[in-house]
């Protein structure tokens, strides 16, 4: 029996592009081509289709909501939906009504140009002024944003701020050959970076059905965008991503800024290879920007931090990463990443107030960080499925994510208790040595506790 075109699937996939459909039907003149077209249609249909059979066939849906994009089960038991490639999102995003539009925003990545930023129910995307079509490659499903940061722009005489949004699979350092093999040739989204001044939006620059609500928080661009990003991600079902800001109380450089000398710098200059950039030591990890590729190294993926090429005026930092990413075999994560030519004056601040505070100099603590991350990851999917992430808890009043956090902390406490029970004073010399070490650990624990309290206060402040 001759191979037949899967017309139903093809029409479902290309219903908005009848020209493509007609070209396929015209060129399916051999069994090999027919099979190829059917395989392409099946692949795209699986990427766009709904996992819920009650939604009906895709051909009966006028638009495909991003919430229906399938997730991919992973070997460790939880689902991790990779951010859809840019090409699959443009047509889908264009069907979503724009709720809020911010005009003339300076986008610096993935493209450097002024665009209008549009918030819809499921997307954040850029479009050229006076057009209604999203810009290819600058369309971001709100559910797939994994990290969001609010950072001052270095070396500017006037205060400006960068918003950095990192979709899944966009921020870890990958080997050069990984891009060609990842996702069957479909590339993940790049980070989104846009810049705003420390001023209020201009009249007429904020439009859309939600502009009336936005007016109440439009004292500055920052207050407006904090509100817009947080509420949009929550409305789209993204309850895990928090907007994180740099804080000079947590880390700041001792070097004086020539452009704004009265303001503490929350960054240090650092090279990655021949590219100059800036390192930000943040509550959730280390970010290097703002030249491509922007990197973010989450604390729970850092195995250890060490120092090399320590000279009189500069030194290098080497960050060793946990490259074990279940289900992401096609993404080759670099094992070590080095940042060079850091000012020697900042060595103490980086080592004492950040690296040691987070236990990054101690390889033994890497397993604890990894276990905590995996525990939270494993609970995320069931939490989303049960609609617990919106803040509704069980009988104990906790959400699933909060419960995972408590379990992780309890696990670490149990390990510490076991170590104390197994402790044998031994000889006098051993006892003295371990006693001194215990004192240092107590100091570290107190510092870590204070730091975590500040971190929680900061996150609550951003959400409010």
UniProtKB/Swiss-Prot annotation:
Keywords: Chaperone, Chromosome, DNA-binding, Nucleus, Transcription, Transcription regulation. Its main location: nucleus. Pfam families: Rttp106-like_middle (PF08512). Residues 382-464 are annotated as: Disordered. Residues 412-464 have a biased composition (Acidic residues). One of its GO terms (molecular function) is histone binding. InterPro entries: PH-like_dom_sf, RTT106/SPT16-like_middle_dom, RTT106/SSRP1_HistChap/FACT. Interacts with histones H3 and H4. Belongs to the RTT106 family. This is Histone chaperone RTT106.
């Amino acid at each position: 029996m001759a191979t037949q075109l899967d017309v139903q699937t093809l029409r479902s996939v290309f219903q908005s592009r009848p020209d493509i459909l007609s070209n396929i039907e015209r060129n399916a003149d051999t069994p090999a081509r027919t099979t190829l077209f059917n395989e392409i249609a099946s692949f795209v249909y699986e990427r766009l289709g709904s996992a819920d059979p009650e939604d009906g066939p895709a051909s009966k849906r006028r638009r495909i909501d991003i919430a229906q994009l399938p997730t991919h089960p992973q070997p460790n038991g939880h689902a991790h939906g990779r951010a859809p490639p840019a090409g699959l999102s443009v047509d889908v995003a264009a069907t979503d009504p724009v709720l809020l539009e911010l005009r003339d925003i300076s986008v610096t990545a993935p493209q450097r140009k002024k665009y209008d930023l549009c918030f819809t129910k499921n997307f954040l995307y850029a479009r050229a002024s006076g057009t209604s079509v999203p810009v290819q490659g600058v369309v971001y499903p709100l559910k797939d944003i994994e990290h969001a940061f609010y950072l001052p722009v270095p070396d500017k005489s006037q205060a400006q701020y960068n918003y950095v949004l990192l979709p899944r699979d966009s921020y870890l350092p990958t080997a050069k050959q990984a891009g060609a093999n990842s996702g069957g040739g479909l590339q993940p989204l790049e980070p989104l970076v846009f810049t705003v001044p420390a001023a209020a939006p201009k009249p007429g620059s904020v439009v859309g059905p939600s502009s009336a609500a936005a007016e109440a928080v439009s004292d500055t661009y920052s207050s407006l965008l904090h509100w817009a990003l947080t509420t949009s991600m929550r409305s789209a079902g993204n309850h895990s991503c928090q907007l994180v800001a740099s804080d000079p109380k947590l880390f700041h450089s001792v070097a004086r800024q020539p452009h704004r000398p009265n303001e503490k710098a929350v960054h240090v200059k650092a090279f990655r290879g021949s590219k100059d950039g800036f390192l930000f030591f943040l509550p959730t990890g280390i970010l290097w920007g703002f030249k491509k590729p922007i990197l973010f190294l989450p604390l729970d993926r850092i195995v250890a931090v060490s120092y090399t090429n320590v000279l009189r005026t500069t030194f290098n930092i080497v960050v060793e990463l946990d490259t074990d990413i279940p289900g992401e075999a096609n993404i080759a994560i670099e094992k070590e990443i080095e940042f060079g030519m850091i000012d020697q004056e900042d060595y103490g601040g980086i080592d004492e107030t950040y690296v040691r505070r987070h236990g990054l100099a101690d390889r033994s603590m890497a397993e604890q960080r990894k276990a905590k991350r995996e525990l939270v990851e494993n609970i995320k999917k069931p939490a989303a499925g049960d609609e617990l992430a919106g803040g509704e808890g069980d009988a104990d009043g906790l959400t699933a994510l909060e419960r995972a956090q408590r379990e992780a902390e309890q696990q670490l406490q149990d390990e510490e208790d076991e170590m104390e029970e197994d402790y044998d004073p031994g000889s006098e010399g051993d006892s003295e040595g371990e006693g001194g070490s215990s004192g240092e650990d107590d100091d570290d624990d107190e510092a870590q506790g204070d730091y975590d309290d500040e971190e929680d206060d900061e996150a609550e402040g951003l959400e409010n």
